[in-house]
Every structure is written in structure tokens, then in C-alpha cells.
């Protein structure tokens, strides 16, 4: 089954052709980082405009890369999928309209996909050995969620962030340090040359809860910089390394404690922050020590992409069936992670 998927929830315009949920025949991603860098964050209006300007070309390229054109689209594509939320309202609308238009023209079923579902299953694209149930940690610019995935579309959300998401924490830390946007990749690169033990930032483990909180680490950095302003490259390297270490240890500790508590031997990471080199390293090493398999998507599938939407859509239609009469579906910017309904 070939699914043509579209993802426009935030600042990446992406389209992909996915066969049977696991074989990516094409994936095209247009990033808006350069557009938003000067504002040190995503500007919703600019994001929507960029999606409008690039969606047609991205769709054409994704189809072309898969050996499909608009003439044989009807024969080679079985269903359309799009990100229905959460995300920026205007951005979501662009992808939804594009997918609905194609579904109407070619009389194909339409599959709405939760963006978080995409991150949950992104590791399955390259790791077919992932078995259910598993513990999933979604870490991105807007989300930090710990979820037990009991079956496809059957979840138990253990905890989420009480304030800043992990990605937000990195972005805000970078701004305090005078670095550019997005902060996560920049801090990750600089930290490689630093000493992670130079500064002992707080680890907010929140005993008795599976929730996360990164405002404490952010405040600790702010207070440290008030009395220890950055004066040289070595100091900057050490601060970045120490901050990265604190975030990585917090995420890892919570995840493995949850896996132990719920007797789960598989942990799956997803979301843009899972691209962080130290987070990947710590999780893999801790997994080996605890006889727990850790699955992390490759970098292209860690950040927002339409292939993960196509993957989730395939398993969703297998469980819930296909619908041809849902063209009136509207995106939901605040869509929570929820169990699939038959």
C-alpha cells in the first residue's frame, strides 16, 4: 500500500511516499531555519507563508523521486495522509488543504495523523525489530512526553513537561549564551570541546512523578551567568557541555526508571532533540548496562518529516480502516496524543 503523506505542523514542509508503512520510497524536507533564525524562534505568520510558497514544489519532488507523476498518481497512490495536529494553526492548514485537494481530485481516502504518532513510530522505519509494547520518549522543541505504547494506537501517557520542553530549554540557553537559533544543534557541537563536569547544573528529577521540568536548569544557567559571564571560548565550551549533560541525564534517568517500573525492555526515542549526540550516546550506553534495547531514528527521521506521518498512517488504517468521507476534517493545533478510535 502506497501512502502519500504531507507534514507541515511547524517549520518544515515535507512530503513522502511510504510503502506499507516501513519502506520510504521518497522523502523531501524543506527547512525554514534560515527564515526564523533572525527572530530566534518560529514566527507563525512567516511559517505559513513559506509552506504556501513551497508546498507544491515539495509535493512534486517527492512524487518524482518515487517515480510517480500526476498522470499515474491514481494508479500508484492508495491513500493520502496529513498531519492534523498539534502544531501551528496556519501551517497545519496548508498541509491539510493540499492533502484534501489531492484526495478529492483522485478520489482517495484521507488519513489524519497526530504529529506525535509520527514521532512515536519514526524508529520503525529503519528498525523492523522494534516489538510492542515499548516505552517512548518524545523530545522536541514543543514536546517532552513519556509514553507507554501498549499497541498501535493504544497509549498510556506517563508524563510530560510542566514548563519548557527539552528543545525549548536548549533554544533559551543558546540565547542566554549569545548563540544563534536553533540552539540545540549549536550547543551540541560546542559542547563536544567542553568539560561536562565544569558546572554542576541542577537535575530536576521530580520525585514521585514522571513529568519533566526544565525551567530549573534554565534558571540555574541564568543565575550562573550573572556571576560568571562568558569571557573566553573554553568557558563557553564548558558551560555548553555542562548544560547538555544535565538535560541528557535528566531525560535518561526518567526514561530508564519508567522502563524498570513498567517492566519494559525496549525504549524508543523520537523528535528533533533525539538528534543530540550526547543523548543518543547516553541512552545507548545505559541500555546496554540495563539489558534494555534502545531504538533511535536516524537524523533525517528525528526531525519533522512526512515519512513518519506515512508510517503512522499505514498502521492507523490497518487498525481503524480507511475512510472516504472525512474531507471535512479540520486540523487541531492543540491535538493531544490519544488512543485511536475504530
Curated annotation (Swiss-Prot):
Keyword Magnesium tagged: no
Cofactor: Fe(2+)
GO biological process, one term: tRNA threonylcarbamoyladenosine modification
Residues binding Fe cation, per UniProt: 115, 119, 304
EC annotation from Swiss-Prot or TrEMBL: 2.3.1.234
Co-factor binding details: Binds 1 Fe(2+) ion per subunit.
Keyword Iron: yes
Location(s) in or outside the cell: Cytoplasm
Top class in the EC scheme: transferase
SUPFAM superfamilies registered for this protein in UniProt: Actin-like ATPase domain
Swiss-Prot/TrEMBL catalytic activity: L-threonylcarbamoyladenylate + adenosine(37) in tRNA = N(6)-L-threonylcarbamoyladenosine(37) in tRNA + AMP + H(+)
Domain of life, per lineage: Bacteria
InterPro entries noted in UniProt: ATPase_NBD, Gcp-like_dom, KAE1/TsaD, Peptidase_M22_CS, TsaD
Family (UniProt): Belongs to the KAE1 / TsaD family.
PANTHER family on file: TRNA N6-ADENOSINE THREONYLCARBAMOYLTRANSFERASE, TRNA N6-ADENOSINE THREONYLCARBAMOYLTRANSFERASE, MITOCHONDRIAL
Protein's name in the database: tRNA N6-adenosine threonylcarbamoyltransferase
Organism (species): Endomicrobium trichonymphae
Gene giving rise to this polypeptide: tsaD
Amino acid at each position: 500500500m502506497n501512502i502519500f503523506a504531507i507534514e507541515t505542523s511547524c517549520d518544515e514542509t515535507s512530503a513522502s511516499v511510504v510503502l506499507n508503512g516501513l519502506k520510504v520510497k521518497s522523502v523531501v524536507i524543506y527547512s525554514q531555519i534560515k527564515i526564523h533564525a533572525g527572530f530566534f524562534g518560529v514566527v507563525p505568520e512567516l511559517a505559513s507563508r513559506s509552506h504556501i510558497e513551497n508546498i507544491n514544489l515539495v509535493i512534486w519532488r517527492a512524487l518524482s523521486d518515487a517515480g510517480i507523476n500526476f498522470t499515474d498518481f491514481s494508479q500508484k497512490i492508495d491513500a493520502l495522509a496529513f498531519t492534523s495536529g498539534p502544531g501551528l494553526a496556519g501551517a497545519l492548514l496548508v498541509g491539510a488543504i493540499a492533502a484534501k485537494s489531492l484526495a478529492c481530485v483522485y478520489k482517495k481516502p484521507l488519513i489524519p495523523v497526530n504529529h506525535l504518532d509520527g514521532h512515536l513510530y519514526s524508529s520503525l522505519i529503519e528498525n523492523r525489530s522494534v516489538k510492542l509494547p515499548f516505552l517512548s520518549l518524545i523530545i522536541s522543541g514543543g514536546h517532552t512526553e513519556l509514553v507507554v505504547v501498549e499497541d498501535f494506537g493504544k497509549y498510556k501517557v506517563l508524563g510530560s513537561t510542566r514548563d519548557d520542553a527539552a528543545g525549548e530549554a536548549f533554544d533559551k540557553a543558546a540565547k542566554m549564551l549569545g548563540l544563534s537559533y536553533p540552539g540545540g544543534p549549536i550547543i551540541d557541537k560546542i559542547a563536544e570541546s567542553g568539560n561536562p563536569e565544569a558546572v554542576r547544573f541542577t537535575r530536576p528529577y521530580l520525585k514521585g512523578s514522571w513529568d519533566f521540568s526544565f525551567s530549573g536548569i534554565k534558571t540555574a544557567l541564568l543565575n550562573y551567568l550573572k556571576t560568571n559571564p562568558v569571557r573566553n571560548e573554553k568557558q563557553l565550551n564548558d558551560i555548553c557541555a555542562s548544560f547538555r549533560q544535565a538535560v541528557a541525564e535528566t531525560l535518561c534517568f526518567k526514561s530508564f526508571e519508567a522502563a524498570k517500573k513498567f517492566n519494559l525492555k525496549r525504549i524508543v526515542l523520537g523528535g528533533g532533540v533525539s538528534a543530540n549526540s550526547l543523548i543518543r550516546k547516553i541512552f545507548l550506553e545505559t541500555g546496554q548496562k540495563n539489558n534494555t534495547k534502545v531504538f533511535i531514528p536516524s537524523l533525517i527521521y528525528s526531525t519533522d518529516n512526512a515519512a513518519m506521518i506515512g508510517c503512522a498512517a499505514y498502521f492507523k488504517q490497518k487498525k481503524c480502516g480507511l475512510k472516504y468521507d472525512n474531507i471535512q476534517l479540520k486540523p487541531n493545533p492543540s491535538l493531544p496524543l490519544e488512543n485511536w478510535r475504530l
